[in-house]
From Swiss-Prot:
Top-level lineage group: Bacteria
Molecular-function GO terms, alphabetical: GTP binding; GTPase activity; guanosine tetraphosphate binding; translation release factor activity, codon nonspecific; translation release factor activity, codon specific
The species this protein was found in: Actinobacillus succinogenes (strain ATCC 55618 / DSM 22257 / CCUG 43843 / 130Z)
Family: Belongs to the TRAFAC class translation factor GTPase superfamily. Classic translation factor GTPase family. PrfC subfamily.
GO CC terms, sorted: cytosol
Protein name, UniProt field: Peptide chain release factor 3
NCBIfam families named among the record's database cross-references: prfC, PRK00741.1, small_GTP
Sequence ranges assigned to domain tr-type G in this UniProt record: 8-277
Single GO BP term: regulation of translational termination
Lineage: Bacteria, Pseudomonadati, Pseudomonadota, Gammaproteobacteria, Pasteurellales
Length: 526
């Protein structure tokens, strides 16, 4: 197959949802339809507690939330699909944000009993920044749901995106009978398939087919016809251009738990979602059809293999083809490296990649030299942009139970901060270590991982820090004066960038007024 054909068949997407809308279940079922795992949700761990194949860190298994982004590749129709799983828990916005910079489309999962929830709103704001195309799956139709028309109205008014229903539900809860496909004029009858059983679906052609009345009952069939008249009059038709521009979302109904409807949106994804897209770099735009290799690191994951203390850098291939043993330029440090052991991911199973194309995600073994946002090329000096670091909103001082382990603590914290799990600040005025996070859960994750991965027992104490800003100043003399007078409030972050840690917002505002030549940044490009 030629290079352009390989690129054209790639689809790289992420699933976004509010916690508990059923994202992990959908991830499993998607893999099931892609034949990537045999028994969804029953991948047995030690002991017999079952856990999904994509939730693979210890704490995730205990809490049932996906904390780290996993990558899964599977074939579907004539495409090769890369699914990036994003943390569903509300705390992990940074990691999720960075993952969304590496995909070309998203599937938004909505719990049809609840409708649009706040986390969904936040994630949609992020996809807006790059006008990412969105597909929507209304999940949990085997339960009692809200009125489907109401759900569409809510998505349109709250998320400011037009809805084009592709399938329409027939009943819900105990009366859920299936869905009607508006563009194929077919009804798919629902039979619950649990676990890894994908039921043969009975298809009834045509809306006026008497078999439909016989199968779902005359009342529901009549209700369906009336609803569809309303839907076709009141809602948008699917429009490929508006979808690609992020202005319209095709909507599918189903139940992931009952293995029903998942294949409908996968058909939509492979048919309509964009192939790997061009990306902005600091000097030019890089097209996916270019034959020279380029890629950027959007995430670093420590200790994916508990047996080896390794760290893997996840890289999105933007253009060209990776081949085992090729020489690439690590642009930030200006060094050429030979990459012979890149990984690909089949749902948590790591295999060595012989090759990878634009749109694929590969894993690079990282011994501390790779950072989030790093660009790799075949020699060209360019840096992909748009992978931000956010100023944390919560701070704690971290302290050791055993003071002799200071070195391990620092090493662990720096590694975790490079990975983007947390940010670490070392004040210039004392030997404290301050940890900054976007959400409370991140603090628990750090202590748990320090213990299991670095054998360090640490505890938190409150610290008088309200917020942090990265500081820069073009005037060297004024900057020196600023540093001299504010040493008490200055720290270095994990990447040795100078940071102002403010005890109160008032203090920050006063400092900004007092030093107009110093710029205080809330986000920083990686």
């Amino acid at each position: 197959m030629s290079y352009p054909q390989e690129v054209d068949k790639r689809r790289t997407f992420a699933i976004i949802s509010h916690p508990d809308a059923g994202k992990t279940t959908i991830t499993e079922k998607v893999l099931l339809y892609g034949n990537a795992i045999q028994t969804a949700g029953s991948v047995k761990g030690k002991g017999s507690q079952a856990h999904a194949k994509s939730d693979w860190m210890e704490m995730e298994k205990q809490r049932g939330i996906s904390i780290t982004t996993s990558v899964m590749q599977f074939p579907y129709n004539d495409c090769l699909v890369n699914l990036l799983d994003t943390p569903g828990h509300e705390d992990f916005s940074e990691d999720t944000y960075r993952t969304l910079t590496a995909v070309d489309s998203c599937l938004m999962v909505i719990d049809a009993a609840k409708g649009v929830e706040d986390r969904t709103i936040k994630l949609m704001e992020v996809t807006r920044l790059r006008d990412t195309p969105i597909l929507t799956f209304m999940n949990k139709l085997d339960r009692d749901i809200r009125d489907p028309m109401e759900l569409l109205d809510e998505v349109e008014s709250v998320l400011k995106i037009h809805c084009a229903p592709i399938t329409w539900p027939i009943g819900c809860g105990k009366l859920f009978k299936g869905v009607y496909h508006l563009y194929k004029d077919e009804t798919y009858l629902y039979q619950s398939g649990q676990g890894s059983t994908i039921q043969e679906v009975r298809i009834i052609k045509g809306l006026d087919n008497p078999q439909l009345d016989a199968a779902v009952g005359a009342d529901l069939a009549q209700q369906l016809r009336e609803e569809l008249e309303l839907v076709q009059g009141a809602s948008n038709e699917f429009d490929q251009e508006l979808f690609i521009g992020g202005e319209l979302t095709p909507v599918f109904f189903g139940t992931a738990l009952g293995n029903f409807g998942v294949n409908h949106f996968l058909d939509g994804l492979t048919q309509w979602a964009p192939k790997p897209q061009a990306r902005k770099a600091d000097t030019r735009i890089v097209e996916s059809a270019e034959e020279k290799f380029t890629g950027f690191v959007f995430k670093i994951q420590a200790n994916m293999d508990p047996k080896h203390r390794d760290r893997v850098a996840f890289m999105r291939v933007v253009s060209g083809k990776y081949e085992k043993g090729m020489k690439l330029k690590h642009v930030r440090i200006g060094k050429d490296v030979v990459i012979s052991d890149a990984l690909t991911f089949m749902a948590g199973d790591r295999t060595h990649a012989e090759q990878a194309y634009a749109g694929d995600i590969i894993g690079l073994h990282n011994h501390g030299t790779i950072q989030i946002g790093d660009t790799f090329t075949q020699g060209e000096d360019l840096k992909f942009t748009g992978i931000p670091n956010f100023a944390p909103e919560l701070f704690r001082r971290i302290r050791l139970r055993d003071p002799l382990k200071q070195k391990q603590l620092l090493k662990g914290l720096v590694q975790l901060s490079e990975e983007g799990a947390v940010q670490v600040f070392r004040p210039l005025a004392n030997n404290d270590l301050i940890v900054g996070a976007v959400g409370v859960l991140q603090f628990d994750v750090v202590v748990a991982r320090l213990k299991t991965e670095y054998n360090v027992e640490a505890v938190y104490e409150n610290v008088n820090v309200a917020t942090a800003r990265w500081v820069e100043c073009a005037d060297e003399k004024k900057f020196e004066e600023f540093k001299r007078k504010n040493e008490q409030n200055l720290a270095l972050d994990g990447g040795d960038n100078l940071t102002y840690i403010a005890p109160t917002m008032v203090n920050l505002n006063l400092s900004q007024e007092r030093y107009p030549d110093v710029t205080f940044f809330k986000t920083r490009e990686h």
